[in-house]
Amino acid sequence: MLNVGFIGFGSRASGFWKRNLAPFGLCTVKAIADPRLEEIKAVWGEELPDCTWYTNAEEMMEKEKLDGVFVGTRCNLHTKYALLVAKYDVPLFLEKPVSITDEEIAQLESIPHMDKKTVVSFPLRVAQLVTVVKDIIDRGVIGEVAQVQAYNNVNYARVYYHGWYRDTDITGGLFLQKSTHDLDYINYVLGRTGPKTVCAMESKLVFKGDKPAGLKCVDCPEYLTCSESPYNIEKYDTKRVIANAKCCYATDTGNHDSATVLMQYDDGLCVTYTQNFIARKGAGKRGARFIGYKGTVEFDFNSKTVTYYDHMSDRVDNISIQSTGSHSGGDLKLAQNFIDVMTGKDVSHSPLSQGILSAKMCLAARKSAQTHTFVEL
């Protein structure tokens, strides 16, 4: 049985354990370090009887003999704890983004020995939809890729304006929160080491306003009439209600509500990626179109489809991928890969170097949007 330690055991880490790691029956939660110790023990204590509990990650790493560590803290602590785990040379599952500043990226680049034993949480790159698209492209079916058009219309985006994700000091902003996934799978499908130039623009046209900073929805005089209050959201979108929601029209919401990134690779290939956080319900889409001289292949995570268009005939192939599980089944594949890394059977399929590359691209996009300049990588 593999002994896994968790640094941070919030909804993402605990959910990943229960839905993806635990079902294999090969791991046990040996230790958890989280400052919310008593709160977490109250929920998980009975289910994890063999777990040793800590409030301090350094103490956990010093005292426990672990086969692997899952870092599931908030984003501004990912690098700090990756460096801690690296001191013990233990396989690491690291949540994205791996870093939110250039300084943190430099720190991660100082631990190259962790590259192939770190599984970065990039489940989209290993989702079956992406695997099918990559296979089509690698076989030369569409010819050399001449353009990529990628998109993400996030229909569950209230969390980025009502909850803690609105604090960009913690998250680094929505390029690092959302784009990091998509830019990674684009690099992976293309088999590229990243673009040479990045530029981006962002806008904030909806979730802005002059309400007081820190205002909670329940304390607002417009609670019963505001279409974004939990009171009204509950009527038509019950899965998207945020507990203790803060006003998304306050002065401290942070985060753009739409943005577009343009990237150019060494050979001149141009890639566009656009994201918005205004679309709702059926308007949600996430995927990309890869265009070559001989054909086009596109996919969409929401509809679970891959479509191939032959440019030389009227042929159109539609492939339905009925993947189940979070992130289109990618989380389960990452969990299996992490187990294989811990047992020495395989190396990471989403190594630290790719997490660093994606973070660099996102930071370049953020800098470009803020300075209205092209940024060289």
Predicted ranges, named:
Residues 1-48, 186:
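N-terminal Rossmann-like dinucleotide-binding module
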Residues 12, 35-39, 281, 324-336, ...:
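Active-site loop of classical SDR/Rossmann-like NAD(P)-dependent oxidoreductases
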Residues 1-3, 144-147, 270:
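Residues that mark the start of a beta-strand
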Residues 68-70, 266-267, 298, 303-305, ...:
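C-terminal helix-rich "cap/oligomerization" subdomain common to oxidoreductases
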Residues 159, 177, 181-303, 334-340, ...:
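Contiguous beta-strand/loop segments that form the cofactor/metal-binding neighborhood of enzyme cores
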Residues 49-111:
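Beta-loop-alpha module in the N-terminal Rossmann-like domain of NAD(P)-dependent dehydrogenases
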Residues 76, 99-162, 167-175, 180-183:
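A contiguous active-site-proximal alpha/beta segment in oxidoreductase catalytic domains
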